[in-house]
A protein has these predicted regions:
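Acidic ATP/Mg2+-coordinating residue in the GHKL
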Residues: 107
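Conserved glycine-/histidine-rich ATP-lid loop and adjacent helix of the Bergerat-fold HATPase_c
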Residues: 146-155
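Short conserved segment of the HATPase_c
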Residues: 112-126
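Conserved catalytic submotifs in the C-terminal HATPase_c
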Residues: 47-58
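Glycine-rich phosphate-binding loop
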Residues: 135-146
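Conserved DHp (HisKA) dimerization/phosphotransfer helix of two-component histidine kinases, i.e.
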Residues: 1-46
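Short beta-strand/loop element within the Bergerat-fold HATPase_c
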Residues: 88-99
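Glycine-rich ATP-binding loops of the HATPase_c
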Residues: 155-162
C-alpha cells in the first residue's frame, strides 16, 4: 500500500495534462494530494486535518506545481515526526480565499532543526537537515526551495509562522 501510494505520487507528477496551465480549483488539487498520500500517512500514524472555506480557489495553474508544494510539506513533516517523540502526530492545512489563496500549514512536531540560525535558510537551494546516523547528508535540499520558487513563480509570498514546537508556514497566492 505504501509503495503503491509512492508510485502514484511519482507517476502523477509526469502526466502530460499536468504540464499545461489549466484553470483548476486549487482546493481540489490539494485534497487530491492528501488523499494520494493517505496510505503513507496511515502507516506513519499522521493525521491530516484539511479545513476549507466555502470559496473556490480557481486559477490557471500547472497542477503539478501545487502537488509538489504539498507533497514536499507533508513528506517533510512525516520525516520530522519520525525523528521526534511526538505521539499525536497532526498536520493542519487551512485554506481560505479572498483575492488570494491563503494556506496556513501547521504540524505539531519539534519544529526547525537548531542548525538553522536564520530560519529562512530552509528555503535556500541545497539547505537540508536530513542526515543519516553517521552524519552524512541524505537530504537533497530541494523541497523547501521548490516550495519557495513555486510560490514566487505565481507572484505569491510565504512566511514562517512557527519554528519551535511545530512547524508553520503561511502561503499567499493571488487568484
Amino acid at each position: 500500500q505504501f509503495l503503491k501510494s509512492w508510485i502514484t505520487v511519482v507517476t502523477n507528477q509526469s502526466k502530460k495534462d499536468k504540464r499545461k496551465r489549466l484553470k483548476k480549483n486549487i482546493y481540489d488539487t490539494i485534497e487530491k494530494i492528501v488523499n494520494v498520500l493517505q496510505p503513507i500517512l496511515v502507516q506513519k500514524k499522521v493525521q491530516v486535518e484539511l479545513i476549507k472555506d466555502e470559496q473556490n480557489a480557481e486559477r490557471r495553474i500547472f497542477e503539478s506545481d501545487f502537488e509538489s508544494i504539498f507533497y514536499n510539506l507533508i513528506i517533510n513533516s512525516i520525516e520530522a515526526f519520525s525523528k521526534s517523540s511526538t505521539k499525536n502526530r497532526k498536520i493542519r492545512i487551512e485554506l481560505k480565499t479572498n483575492e488570494n489563496l491563503v494556506v496556513n500549514y501547521l504540524d505539531n512536531g519539534d519544529g526547525l532543526d537548531n542548525k538553522f540560525k536564520n530560519p529562512y535558510e530552509i528555503f535556500t537551494l541545497g539547505s537540508t537537515s536530513k542526515y543519516d546516523q553517521f552524519g552524512n547528508v541524505i537530504g537533497t535540499g530541494l523541497g523547501m526551495y521548490i516550495i519557495a520558487s513555486t510560490v514566487r513563480e505565481y507572484n505569491g509570498d510565504y512566511k514562517l509562522t512557527q519554528i519551535q514546537n511545530g512547524f508553520g508556514l503561511e502561503i499567499r497566492i493571488p487568484l
